[in-house]
């Protein structure tokens, strides 16, 4: 059986921390920002953690 491939799009979007958690950037912070409040844009700048319910799917895409 051949090696399983890593999802290259996922590699560009997620980073695994030393403790095994997966970091991701927030969505909705690329364009059409004028109608979004400063408070909302400030919150969207922060790095988020992948939700426990999504961990398995993301881990399989990363194949670490």
Curated annotation (Swiss-Prot):
GO terms for cellular component: cytosolic large ribosomal subunit. Keywords: Ribonucleoprotein, Ribosomal protein. It comes from the Bacteria. Disulfide bonds: none annotated. GO terms for biological process: translation. The keyword Ribosomal protein applies. GO terms for molecular function: structural constituent of ribosome. InterPro entries: Ribosomal_bL35, Ribosomal_bL35-like, Ribosomal_bL35_CS, Ribosomal_bL35_sf. Belongs to the bacterial ribosomal protein bL35 family. This is Large ribosomal subunit protein bL35. It comes from Coxiella burnetii (strain RSA 493 / Nine Mile phase I). The lineage of its organism: Bacteria, Pseudomonadati, Pseudomonadota, Gammaproteobacteria, Legionellales.
């Amino acid at each position: 059986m051949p090696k399983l491939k890593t999802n290259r799009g996922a590699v560009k979007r997620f980073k695994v921390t030393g403790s095994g958690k997966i970091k991701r950037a927030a969505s909705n912070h690329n364009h059409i920002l004028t109608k979004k409040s400063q408070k909302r844009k400030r919150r969207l700048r922060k790095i988020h953690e992948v939700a426990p319910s999504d961990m398995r799917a993301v881990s399989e895409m990363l194949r670490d």
